[in-house]
Amino acid sequence: SFDELQKRIIDLPYDGNNYDSDEVVKLNKVSIRYGDRTILNELDWTVHRGEKWALSGENGAGKSTLLSLVCADNPQSYACDISLFGRKRGTGESIWEIKKHIGYVSPEMHRAYLKNLPAIEIVASGLHDSIGLYKRPQPEQMAVCEWWMDIFGIADLKDKPFLQLSSGEQRLALLARAFVKDPELLILDEPLHGLDTYNRRRVKKVIEAFCKRKDKTMIMVTHYESE
């Protein structure tokens, strides 16, 4: 049952976050322009540890741009006044030091992942933030991947090549990938996109349970108020 599912997530051990800042994201007068289009204009935004944010707005309103800044994926982020986990960008931290705290999924990512690896290896790539695996996962890491695949109802697909999964199953695998390192900051860009009614309910329950845990921070982009 979904109640049992939620309990399993809420009961996960709390490993303590390894960054010591109350501010997870801080943008100070951030502007992003592409050519003569201004996507973000002098935006101030602070996300504190444990907060849950929903971003909604039209396509092209800058939501994905905002997420790419937070994920440290945007090439313009170095020029902007942005701090992540209490550390200002461009003060010597590597992108991997930032990413180790972040779990992320988006529809764009789905298009980038056309790799014919077994589904569990796609999930495992979330442990190291690589699209292809650089390191073979250890057995205990594989067990964690299987645990999250089970949470999303796809444990029986772990050895199936990713490209042979249905589109909805691929989405669930990429969601499992976002959760697999039990991140401090979870960034979900339209997490229910492309799912059927049953799996939308399931994923909502997983997200709700994750959000009940101590100090977990979430930013979710949605097109729909109802989500």
PLM features per residue range, with description:
Residues 25, 40-42:
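Conserved structural motif at the start of ABC-family nucleotide-binding domains
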Residues 137, 161-165, 169:
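Conserved ABC ATPase signature
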Residues 124, 139-157:
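Conserved ABC ATPase "signature" region
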Residues 175-176:
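Hydrophobic anchor residue at the start of the ABC signature
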Residues 71-72:
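Helix-to-loop junction immediately C-terminal to a conserved catalytic motif
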